[in-house]
Amino acid sequence: MGRGVRVLLLLSLLHCAGGSEGRKTWRRRGQQPPPPPRTEAAPAAGQPVESFPLDFTAVEGNMDSFMAQVKSLAQSLYPCSAQQLNEDLRLHLLLNTSVTCNDGSPAGYYLKESRGSRRWLLFLEGGWYCFNRENCDSRYDTMRRLMSSRDWPRTRTGTGILSSQPEENPYWWNANMVFIPYCSSDVWSGASSKSEKNEYAFMGALIIQEVVRELLGRGLSGAKVLLLAGSSAGGTGVLLNVDRVAEQLEKLGYPAIQVRGLADSGWFLDNKQYRHTDCVDTITCAPTEAIRRGIRYWNGVVPERCRRQFQEGEEWNCFFGYKVYPTLRCPVFVVQWLFDEAQLTVDNVHLTGQPVQEGLRLYIQNLGRELRHTLKDVPASFAPACLSHEIIIRSHWTDVQVKGTSLPRALHCWDRSLHDSHKASKTPLKGCPVHLVDSCPWPHCNPSCPTVRDQFTGQEMNVAQFLMHMGFDMQTVAQPQGLEPSELLGMLSNGS
């Protein structure tokens, strides 16, 4: 066992033993306790105690082995604190009841505090949007939980990056976790209240601001890092709000809190639909037209630096990741499936279980190529060539890899590269990649992709079965790889 791990083990055992009531004092009988150090005041009762920092400088040459030992150590020590730890996130409705969901009920958040940590993770839920009275009425009838807090449960269990289990969440399990339910239907951009004129309130941007304000009184004021994360509409919400959160904290007197973003499945393209349809509802409306209508209906706000890039009335451009990202000051890690199911849906691509015709197959392949191109200048990105949607709060989020690196590992590398800095490092850490974009050109060519099931039979399909189901000619696929079709099929069937 390396010196770094031995030291960590000793400190952790002392920390674990010292956290129990009736603490033992290890000194000879009659010996007086040593005086407290003069350089730092002891923390007041009830205040969080900072975790021991790790010095990685001595173990850079064998970081993977070191982190494997640390993870094993964390898992073995976890039970010593888990007995007193409630894993559930508890609901808190906002004290400022003027900041509401669509129907006027108070917005809120779920919180699980971790008193030994100065890292805070705020997660924005996703769930599409509505952009006029008719489809908002329909949404209220069918998806009321996404427009009202009246039936929210008192607690919820964190999964994926919100999990408090180190085996499911190896690097963030001990952070302060905040889940912010999506009840504004405005991609977290709205700033209009309910009134006689407006049947619904759209206050997504204001909800985030108010949650941050309340959390300052619950320990966020002592944070070192705030990671604003989100999936789908929540991922787009991260891009729209991360700089605003940093500016808010600075104005309130907390400039030292490092604000970062993690946008999952919210990096959409304003591309041409496969089949153009009239804009009658959320699903069939082209992305550009839906957002153009929505931003007016919601009184939506976008990042100021992005807004200045476009003429008045063209602010909708800032909802698209590749346009807003270059204007952001805060570092953002982008997670995006190259063949995102929500993107395909708004592009009117519907995979019905029938073999895909050549025109559609080429459209899907080109979509992956376009998305890959938009990520070429995003230094921190994870883009598997999979047909899926959302990942970071899925329990299987540790399974998917790009070029041999998992998403939690990539996020950890990114975290290290940003240590004590608000700017991305120019030189990536050796053996710790953060720009991970698949280069293979068809859906599910990455064998670690989530399982696909046949829509009619419900049976799982391996990669080879899925590609043939999609209508891919295996001869055409195998030839550029220098393989025979039978060899490629064998490799894909075995998960190679």
Curated annotation (Swiss-Prot):
Keyword Signal applies: yes
Principal place of residence: secreted
Positions of region (Disordered): 21-46
Secretion signal, residue range per the UniProt entry: 1-19
Record-level GO BP terms: bone development; negative regulation of canonical Wnt signaling pathway; negative regulation of Wnt signaling pathway; protein depalmitoleylation; regulation of bone mineralization; Wnt signaling pathway
Entry-listed glycosylation sites: N96
Tissue expression from the record: Rarely expressed in adult normal tissues.
Entry's EC annotation: 3.1.1.98
UniProt-annotated catalytic positions: S232, D340, H389
Cellular location(s): Secreted
Catalytic activity: [Wnt protein]-O-(9Z)-hexadecenoyl-L-serine + H2O = [Wnt protein]-L-serine + (9Z)-hexadecenoate + H(+)
GO molecular function annotations of the record: palmitoleyl hydrolase activity; phospholipase C activity; protein-containing complex destabilizing activity
Induction remark: Up-regulated in hepatocellular carcinoma (HCC) with high intracellular beta-catenin.
Gene Ontology CC annotations of this record: endoplasmic reticulum lumen; extracellular region
PANTHER family (alphabetical): NOTUM-RELATED, PALMITOLEOYL-PROTEIN CARBOXYLESTERASE NOTUM
Function as written in the Swiss-Prot or TrEMBL entry: Carboxylesterase that acts as a key negative regulator of the Wnt signaling pathway by specifically mediating depalmitoleoylation of WNT proteins. Serine palmitoleoylation of WNT proteins is required for efficient binding to frizzled receptors.
Family according to the record: Belongs to the pectinacetylesterase family. Notum subfamily.
Name of the protein in its database record: Palmitoleoyl-protein carboxylesterase NOTUM
Taxonomic classification: Eukaryota, Metazoa, Chordata, Craniata, Vertebrata
Name of the gene encoding the protein in the UniProt record: NOTUM
